[in-house]
């Protein structure tokens, strides 16, 4: 059934109702915060945000006698938006409730535009972004390349992970091998694993140890299954593929941080169908295609759009094999999706 289209007045009314609900929730939260701060709060200490639930977050204590314990914390109104992976200063209250009083500086930030085009952080202090895809649902180079551009733009090292390797067969093997070969040639690390059978999971674990990682990828590629395999004690629900669309049903409802026994953390974030890049410029996208680095700026014309212009270095690179057609197609698709003012 086609999705119902809402007119402007209906959209306005929905936003008005949502705004009123948010205001009521904020008022209740403010009253709770006043009660807490009016009571006996403990000293300031550092903590790690391991989950976010609207106006509250779960914080793991990082020092003192309560190190490792988890507290549900309220947020002061003057704080910026917090996300899983943030390091904060907080004070403990009664009955396992606390108050966050400050956000510590982030080393990295992974952001994406929300439905209104506003930038929204989704994870903080990450140093490894694991781009997960699988034989089913069919992987798309354009989506993988969007993640790679986002990783390069954020300064976060990427790892390409083909999950469900046990589903590779004679029909899909040629296309998958060709896809992986492009990224291996570029120097990106690529792993093939099967969370279901356990193949390659030790190699994946060694890549994750000592890092703060986040799994990204469309729904149905097995991110939750990977978490369950890496951390059997977790309770991450796994959803089946939709029989109608062949895409995954969303299971994880909030980004959550897990610890590995040998050190390092994993942030399991909600599955998303497409990673928006409306917040980046044309130059950012070009910088995100690492094989372009030696070519950008060498075109005959300074305002070259790398389409049909004579003397275009990227088109020459395409002819010479330095640039793969698959990547050029992704680049053009991403550029076409950017707002006009990003050019």
Curated annotation (Swiss-Prot):
What does the record give as the organism's lineage?
Bacteria, Pseudomonadati, Pseudomonadota, Gammaproteobacteria, Pseudomonadales
Compartments annotated for it: namely:
Cytoplasm
Which NCBIfam families does the record associate with it? PRK12288.1, ribosome small subunit-dependent GTPase A
Species in which this protein is naturally found = Pseudomonas syringae pv. syringae (strain B728a)
**UniProt KW NADP keyword:** no
Under the heading HAMAP family, the entry gives:
GTPase_RsgA
Protein's recorded name: Small ribosomal subunit biogenesis GTPase RsgA
Which Cys-Cys disulfides exist here? none
- What's a GO cellular component annotated to this UniProt protein? cytoplasm
